Amino acid sequence: MLGDGNEGISTIPGFNQIQFEGFCRFIDQGLTEELYKFPKIEDTDQEIEFQLFVETYQLVEPLIKERDAVYESLTYSSELYVSAGLIWKNSRDMQEQTIFIGNIPLMNSLGTSIVNGIYRIVINQILQSPGIYYRSELDHNGISVYTGTIISDWGGRSELEIDRKARIWARVSRKQKISILVLSSAMGLNLREILENVCYPEIFLSFLNDKERKKIGSKENSILEFYQQFACVGGDPVFSESLCKELQKKFFQQRCELGRIGRRNMNRKLNLDIPQNNTFLLPRDILAAADHLIGLKFGMGALDDMNHLKNKRIRSVADLLQDQFGLALVRLENVVRGTICGAIRHKLIPTPQNLVTSPPLTTTYESFFGLHPLSQVLDRTNPLTQIVHGRKLSYLGPGGLTGRTASFRIRDIHPSHYGRICPIDTSEGINVGLIGSLSIHARIGHWGSLESPFYEISERSTGVRMLYLSPGSDEYYMVAAGNSLALNRDIQEEQVVPARYRQEFLTIAWEQVHLRSIFPFQYFSIGASLIPFIEHNDANRALMSSNMQRQAVPLSRSEKCIVGTGLERQAALDSGALAIAEREGRIVYTNTDKILLAGNGDILSIPLVIYQRSNKNTCMHQKLRVPRGKCIKKGQILADGAATVGGELALGKNVLVAYMPWEGYNSEDAVLISERLVYEDIYTSFHIRKYEIHTHVTSQGPEKVTNEIPHLEAHLLRNLDKKGIVMLGSWVETGDILVGKLTPQVVKESSYAPEDRLLRAILGIQVSTSKETCLKLPIGGRGRVIDVRWIQKRGGSSYNPETIRVYISQKREIKVGDKVAGRHGNKGIISKILPRQDMPYLQDGRSVDMVFNPLGVPSRMNVGQIFECSLGLAGSLLDRHYRIAPFDERYEQEASRKLVFSELYEASKQTANPWVFEPEYPGKSRIFDGRTGNPFEQPVIIGKPYILKLIHQVDDKIHGRSSGHYALVTQQPLRGRAKQGGQRVGEMEVWALEGFGVAHILQEMLTYKSDHIRARQEVLGTTIIGGTIPNPEDAPESFRLLVRELRSLALELNHFLVSEKNFQINRKEA
């Protein structure tokens, strides 16, 4: 429990702080901890000793900038140098040198690393904390069986269990179990010491028979018995040093290492006073655990809740990077040991620099960032996505759970998550509940626990003090659900308040309260905190909304939301999308790609991001906000980024929406939109695609980039420059050549044309033969070339080919098939784009922009969208923006409804439009059909909610196939757009076709278009010549496959074909 220095003041912490603090902890502590573990290495004759001097290690500032690392596909890393010494023991001479160990990838201020030019992020993992946990299960007779599970630092498990006769067994593997006496004896205790160190010696003596006495008669006997049971070895093994070493390595080192956290948990649970630096399981731990187990058997003590956060620990970035650094040092140790022995054998004089190589550390980190499940490519769809990604918590990964085996209990919300893990924000699908998100104020404590802040309420002092509590600590306090933003903070608090105590929610008197929450958003993640009126939504819809905001595409003309929560500015600030002044000064020069800031006697150049591609193909672009000559302060916003306006997050647009059915075009969550959204570029976004090609050195010679490509039409090469690369600013269409490339190949003599053979015979001219391997623009890739990058190979190696990248920008208007969504889980697909004169219009003549289905509201219980819709209309008429904290009902009953109606009433008065607020049906209005001009029968809810355009766009999903690849075994078309796959006709589709009696279409689906090899070849020919498609004469390949599989089970299956003409049966073998 820690206090904070700021009395009574609470600020939202930086959203990237957890990642950045973790990396700093690794650099400050983790590096030195692992370097101190590096042993002194001696040669076999013990004449030379190699050691590291950790005190003088240094990290060098990178030679390249972040932008250059991304541009050239390099790793943004720092070189690690350590002093090392070689000591000759005979002469006591020492040679000391500063050696280069390897590169460590650095983290930027946004919490991301750049590895091979790609932004990557390491997410935090939740693991079961090492220690001992007690639980109870019913056996087949319905009797409770108590067990204690000891979890080691790396996740290995051993169990203690007590049976009906109060005998205690240790289970070190799934099948075998041994007596607790044998285990204690194998760990070094004799019978007298065992009985002296337990609270219930009579129970231990009760199952001590002659056979047991013989097993524990000596340490050797107990070790042999333990080895026999643990390793499942038959016969009579003989005691030896190698057997002891094997047991030490396989059991005691792997399953008994508790670690620093495990030792602390064990001491707390069993009331032990073993020193913290003793991180291995001791006999005292085993006996104390057995005593506790006996106490549980007789009704003393409490069982453990495995899902409580006090029994979990966070494996942060620091822990993961430190583990990898330790692994790299072990590999380095093996390299140094081998090199010393080789040098002595060949009678060479080694030096510290010759002994140490950098690949072990560099390759370890590259493989970690590239292959580890917790190292992920940073999702950069929009600014919100970037900061949310770094705050994820995962139960998956090495040592964790798997999506298919995790139970419902683990996935469920637990009371200890309050203020630490968001109860809303999790992934959908198989990983639901296994990937969560940190609450806004949560932080990772010293022992790997999640801590949440509270205000302490003290009778002695009028001020308040902020405390950070770990999950187990806050259960002993009465925690009021009220927060410091209450309207009546300075007035006497309410007499009765809702509170939380020992995982229960109670209503108690204010005098009994110990702590209170500090912020309305304290329980939620960033995504959930951006949903206005979230308290009026069903939690499932809020979950969908927090996920869909991360999928919003940055629009070409962003717009601030009228109704927000107040966190939009902080989210934009911490995302890194904005350009912020690092110091005060005056703007002396601006253009599209940089700002020059004068101050303190020098000029600072601030580069801007111009049309940069994200890994989701969205466009990252910064726009100036300050004019030349303006004086600015430190921290002021100089340029807006993608999806930000005025330094606030702006993911969508405020559009005029009506909730009403319209000719069935908005049934089943479909959305009807006006053509105004297309023509006025309201939902237009830019997408940048990357196309690349490599040039290799083949066995026949190097590949050549050129604009002289034979056998290709001239109009396909029209955009190439002299070098054979597409020119900047060119407009390219599908099939155009982006990079002209020729690959040399060997051609047989007979393949040459007659004139080529004549030239070779008479003049001896070698006719070059090469294959055209150009980079062509694929289907759907039309657009404008905005950047071309030619990255030269480093070091001249043929294994590092030259790479040419072409970036093409596409302008995409909203169209039928695109997905749009609100901030309340109300999502839909565009079904029709109506002319604006046909759309319903309001009483002031404005036509509606979107028509949503009203049936999507009551059953889904996301009523927050109605509040936002009406308040947005009032805000647009009054030219106001609202920032509303969640759970405003605590201040006044029906507070949200009263606020919305009062604003609508004010808007009605100020604009002199009585239709804005009509007391008979408040919030609704009579609107007119654009086609006929007649009013609709019922009044309709109209408003201005904030609607997002999502990245699920029809241009990326629409797909057709005429012919393509087939699977080798079944001979059926492959699956998926990326493989040019076919459309699957499943069981239900076949039933639907059968229901309409379309026999010929069914036959085509099951034969020609699928896996009938000969028939599908004949179809192509008959289609070209215009003939009739012949009927297939044999069985399709999938049927033949079924027959073969049945034969493998010794079942013979023959099939027959019946002739259509004379109904003769022809027997055919499969």
Swiss-Prot record:
Subcellular location field: Plastid, Chloroplast
InterPro entries on file: DNA-dir_RNA_pol_bsu_ext_1_sf (IPR042107), DNA-dir_RNA_pol_su2 (IPR015712), DNA-dir_RNAP_su2_dom (IPR007120), DNA-dir_RNAP_su2_hyb_sf (IPR037033), RNA_pol_bsu_bac (IPR010243), RNA_pol_bsu_CS (IPR007121), RNA_pol_Rpb2_2 (IPR007642), RNA_pol_Rpb2_2_sf (IPR037034)
GO MF annotation list: DNA binding; DNA-directed RNA polymerase activity; ribonucleoside binding
Location (main, coarse): plastid
Keywords, comma-separated and alphabetical: Chloroplast, DNA-directed RNA polymerase, Nucleotidyltransferase, Plastid, Transcription, Transferase
Biological process terms in GO annotation: DNA-templated transcription
Disulfide pattern: none
Endpoints of the signal sequence: none
Domain of life: Eukaryota
Key word Calcium present: no
A Pfam family reported for this protein in Swiss-Prot or TrEMBL: RNA_pol_Rpb2_6
Reaction equation(s) it catalyzes: RNA(n) + a ribonucleoside 5'-triphosphate = RNA(n+1) + diphosphate
EC number, UniProt record: 2.7.7.6
One CC-aspect GO term: mitochondrion
Family assignment from sequence similarity: Belongs to the RNA polymerase beta chain family.
HAMAP family named among the record's database cross-references: RNApol_bact_RpoB
Quaternary structure annotation from Swiss-Prot or TrEMBL: In plastids the minimal PEP RNA polymerase catalytic core is composed of four subunits: alpha, beta, beta', and beta''. When a (nuclear-encoded) sigma factor is associated with the core the holoenzyme is formed, which can initiate transcription.
Chain's role: DNA-dependent RNA polymerase catalyzes the transcription of DNA into RNA using the four ribonucleoside triphosphates as substrates.
Name the record gives this protein: DNA-directed RNA polymerase subunit beta
Gene source species: Solanum bulbocastanum (Wild potato)
Encoding gene (name): rpoB
